[in-house]
């Protein structure tokens, strides 16, 4: 089945295969560094997310790729589209801020130090009938620590690649295997 590939693998020699594996590892490490660098620049643990449901239609559709930032100094306003993550839930949610409340800092020392007011938020999907209170798992409001970021831009339908990879894991592993094999057998 893979006899030609095995012959090519033997013909290339150990050093060449090792060099190709090192090049492949460099590409992977570079991708991770770029991802972490984007996270630091945008102050977001996940600066790029994919819309996984239709709850934000017509603003965003399933498969849209969203670009996020999370500036510390900026307060969220009603109407902002945010991505938040509740503790215990592994999927971030993209919804619009419906209400905000500023809570002044507690204690005299905090006020004198000039700490900013903390912000509480209530969100709702544009395509949903009710707010997200039931999604908060016992919380009354979202706090700033739950927010992954504010949507700054998007690319329509580009995220369908991610959705397809998650819906069909065999496709993901097949693509990774083929890419790895091609990287090892490349003759540069």
UniProtKB/Swiss-Prot annotation:
According to the UniProt entry, the coiled-coil residues are none
Which GO molecular function entries does the Swiss-Prot or TrEMBL record give?
A: serine-type endopeptidase activity
The protein's annotated catalytic reaction(s) are:
Cleavage of hydrophobic, N-terminal signal or leader sequences from secreted and periplasmic proteins
Q: Which residues lie on this side of the membrane: Cytoplasmic?
A: 1-20
Say if the entry is tagged with keyword Transmembrane helix.
yes
Q: Where is the active site?
A: 55 (charge relay system), 95 (charge relay system), 132 (charge relay system)
Keyword Protease attributed: yes
Cite the ranges annotated as topological domain Lumenal: 42-188
Q: Would you tell me the Gene Ontology cellular component terms?
A: signal peptidase complex
Record note on quaternary structure: Component of the signal peptidase complex (SPC) composed of a catalytic subunit SEC11 and three accessory subunits SPC1, SPC2 and SPC3. The complex induces a local thinning of the ER membrane which is used to measure the length of the signal peptide (SP) h-region of protein substrates. This ensures the selectivity of the complex towards h-regions shorter than 18-20 amino acids. SPC associates with the translocon complex.
PANTHER family for the chain? SIGNAL PEPTIDASE COMPLEX CATALYTIC SUBUNIT SEC11
Return the domain comment text from this UniProt entry. The C-terminal short (CTS) helix is essential for catalytic activity. It may be accommodated as a transmembrane helix in the thinned membrane environment of the complex, similarly to the signal peptide in the complex substrates.
Instruction: Please give the name of this protein.
Output: Signal peptidase complex catalytic subunit SEC11
């Amino acid at each position: 089945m893979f006899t030609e590939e095995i012959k090519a693998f033997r013909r290339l020699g150990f050093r060449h295969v090792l060099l190709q594996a090192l090049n492949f590892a460099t590409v992977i490490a570079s991708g991770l560094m770029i991802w972490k660098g984007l996270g630091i620049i945008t102050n977001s643990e996940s600066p790029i997310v994919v819309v996984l449901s239709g709850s934000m239609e017509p603003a965003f559709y399933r498969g849209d790729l969203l670009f996020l930032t999370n500036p510390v100094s900026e307060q969220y306003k009603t109407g902002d589209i945010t991505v938040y993550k509740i503790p215990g839930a592994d999927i971030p949610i993209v919804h619009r801020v419906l209400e905000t409340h500023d809570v002044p800092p507690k204690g005299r020392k905090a006020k004198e130090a000039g700490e900013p007011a903390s912000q509480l938020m209530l969100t709702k999907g544009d395509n949903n009938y009710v707010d997200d209170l039931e999604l908060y798992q016992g919380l009354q409001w979202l706090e700033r620590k739950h927010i992954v970021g504010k949507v700054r831009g998007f690319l329509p339908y580009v995220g369908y690649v991610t959705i397809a990879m998650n819906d069909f894991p065999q496709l993901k592993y097949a693509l990774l295997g083929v890419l790895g094999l091609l990287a090892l057998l490349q003759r540069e």
